[in-house]
Amino acid sequence: MKVIVVNDNAHVNGGAAKVAIQEAVGLADRGHSVYFVCAVRPIAQALIHSNINVVCSEQYDLLSNPNQFDAFIQGWWNTKAAHIVGQLLTDLDRTNTIIHLHVWTRALSASVVRASLASDIPIVCTLHDFSLACPTATFFNHPRQQICHLDPLSPACLLTNCDTRNYAQKLWRVGRQFIQQQIGHAPRDIQHVIVHSKLAGEVMQHYLAPGCMVHNLPVYIESTRSPPAHPEAHETFVYLGRLVREKGVLLAARSAAAENIPLTFVGSGPLAEEIRAAHPQACITGWVDHATSVNYLRTARALIFPSMWYETLGLVVLEAAAHGIPSLVPDTSAAREIVLDGVTGLHFRSGDEADLRAKMQQLKDGNLARVLGRAAYDHFWSSNYSSLEDHLSSLENIYRKVLAAERTEDTILVSQLEVQSVR
């Protein structure tokens, strides 16, 4: 099978790129012929593989482009990338080739989606965010710090400044979304999507194409199995991620300070000083490598995951479970699906400081932390999340379903044409 993987970056700059690269390499290891289509270098070392051809348009992503006008146009419609994709797909056998779309909004643009659709090769798209529907890809009102329930591109949406920057940026995103829908034909002509959580499918169900098939694929977490940690032996709670408002870091800082709980923030971001003001005793590590972040996890009482928006999963929660650390997660986040409330961790009401404080207070009980952590560990290592081979087998099964559905559609179309010709 030939697999065309489409992603803005060819290196790991976030969870989506990590998944795209892991899957591409895993499929290549299984003997599939993989083309990795991207816009931005550098190329990850893992992609240097005998069964992988990297096709790069050699461009900037939108934020790093020194030419703002060029970035403005490229973000709406990347003509160069569309041409490269169109040329690549011209001579491929559509009966044994599949296009797997990941992220295209930061460099490649919806032009590559339209070029893919024009090839008539079967397509599947992983929903790493909500960009198929929402102009900001988040369903989140940043100034109000709350989940947005407005219909995307409705008059109410257009008049609402929900952007993380300013209203002018929101209007640019609206333009991009309109072009994606009307010229890029996304999502209306995409018939297969992959989700990593039920919540992602539920949020998107009203915006996908009629008849679109939603395939659930448990994400794989790269983690080496070691004995479970001992959360009962430590008092410090830990947060891993970017220090930005929508991730709920100030909520976490205020709650921990009120309960006199030590809290370590592993990450960097613009809210570092506000966090220090909210919790003067909090430790902020700045950026650290993966091995160091794992050490912070293993010496924590619990992971706090206070995100204010939906999220499409919450990979760090799975990583905490892999080491036997319980997690505190909001009830509006997809992370609630991987934390069994009162069994492998605790849920709290999203944005509710009093409820978060109460749940943190519960986890001051070392015995409870130990029981929840061990249950999280056992649950993780008995699930598909811990097996790359299971993940790849499930992905191949999805590909086979997509190809079979396309063949059935072709057969129906041919039959209809034959009936018409007889008439």
Regions found by a protein language model. Give the residues of each.
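Conserved acidic donor-binding segment of nucleotide-sugar-dependent glycosyltransferases
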Residues: 341-342, 346-353, 361-367
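Nucleotide-activated donor-binding/catalytic signature segment of Leloir-type glycosyltransferases, i.e.
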Residues: 273-295
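Conserved donor-binding/catalytic core segment of Leloir-type glycosyltransferases
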Residues: 194, 221, 229-247, 253-257
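Acidic donor-binding loop of glycosyltransferase active sites
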Residues: 237, 298-312, 325
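N-terminal strand-loop element at the rim of the active site
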Residues: 7-13, 26-79, 88
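Donor nucleotide-sugar binding/catalytic pocket of nucleotide-sugar-dependent glycosyltransferases
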Residues: 132, 145-226
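A charged, aromatic-enriched C-terminal amphipathic alpha-helix characteristic of glycosyltransferases
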Residues: 76, 367, 371-404
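Short hydrophobic beta-strand element within catalytic cores of glycosyltransferases
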Residues: 317, 326-329
